[in-house]
Amino acid sequence: GIISLILQIGNIISIWVSHSIQTGSQNHTGICNQRIITYENSTWVNQTYVNISNTNVVAGKDTTSMTLAGNSSLCPIRGWAIYSKDNSIRIGSKGDVFVIREP
């Protein structure tokens, strides 16, 4: 009981410290204001990586941050999905798309 609680608190603290070390004090708000969208796919084929990169220029698109229904802003998304142990894409009930990568 109490040991499990202490281990979980230690796990959350270590994830927070790791995230703080990786990001530092960087602010990534400029990512949402891009007019160029790059789709990149790295696939393992015959012991080598094949990189496929498609670049699209979004013309005439409004770059302001958009708020969806339910008062959830589309960008930026911050935080950790602590209980997700796999690489996955989750689609929320309001249409939000979350890409979760295993650390």
Curated annotation (Swiss-Prot):
Subcellular location: Virion membrane; Host apical cell membrane
Ways its activity is controlled: Inhibited by the neuraminidase inhibitors zanamivir (Relenza) and oseltamivir (Tamiflu). These drugs interfere with the release of progeny virus from infected cells and are effective against all influenza strains. Resistance to neuraminidase inhibitors is quite rare.
Glycan attachment sites: 27, 41, 46, 51, 71
Entry's cofactor comment: Binds 1 Ca(2+) ion per subunit.
MF term (GO), any: metal ion binding
Top-level taxonomic group: Viruses
Segments in the Virion surface topological domain: 19-103
EC numbers: 3.2.1.18
Binding site for substrate: 101
Regions crossing the membrane: 1-18
Catalytic activity, as annotated: Hydrolysis of alpha-(2->3)-, alpha-(2->6)-, alpha-(2->8)- glycosidic linkages of terminal sialic acid residues in oligosaccharides, glycoproteins, glycolipids, colominic acid and synthetic substrates
Cofactor: Ca(2+)
A GO CC term attached to the entry: virion membrane
Reported modifications of this chain: N-glycosylated.
Membrane topology of the entry: Single-pass type II membrane protein
Keywords assigned by UniProt, alphabetized: Calcium, Glycoprotein, Glycosidase, Host cell membrane, Host membrane, Hydrolase, Membrane, Metal-binding, Signal-anchor, Transmembrane, Transmembrane helix, Virion
Broad class of where this protein is predominantly found: virion
Notes on the domains: Intact N-terminus is essential for virion morphogenesis. Possesses two apical sorting signals, one in the ectodomain, which is likely to be a glycan, and the other in the transmembrane domain. The transmembrane domain also plays a role in lipid raft association.
Assembly notes: Homotetramer.
Note: The influenza A genome consist of 8 RNA segments. Genetic variation of hemagglutinin and/or neuraminidase genes results in the emergence of new influenza strains. The mechanism of variation can be the result of point mutations or the result of genetic reassortment between segments of two different strains.
Role, per record: Catalyzes the removal of terminal sialic acid residues from viral and cellular glycoconjugates. Cleaves off the terminal sialic acids on the glycosylated HA during virus budding to facilitate virus release. Additionally helps virus spread through the circulation by further removing sialic acids from the cell surface. These cleavages prevent self-aggregation and ensure the efficient spread of the progeny virus from cell to cell. Otherwise, infection would be limited to one round of replication.
Family under the similarity heading: Belongs to the glycosyl hydrolase 34 family.
Name this protein carries in UniProt: Neuraminidase
Upper lineage: Viruses, Riboviria, Orthornavirae, Negarnaviricota, Polyploviricotina
Gene designation per UniProt: NA
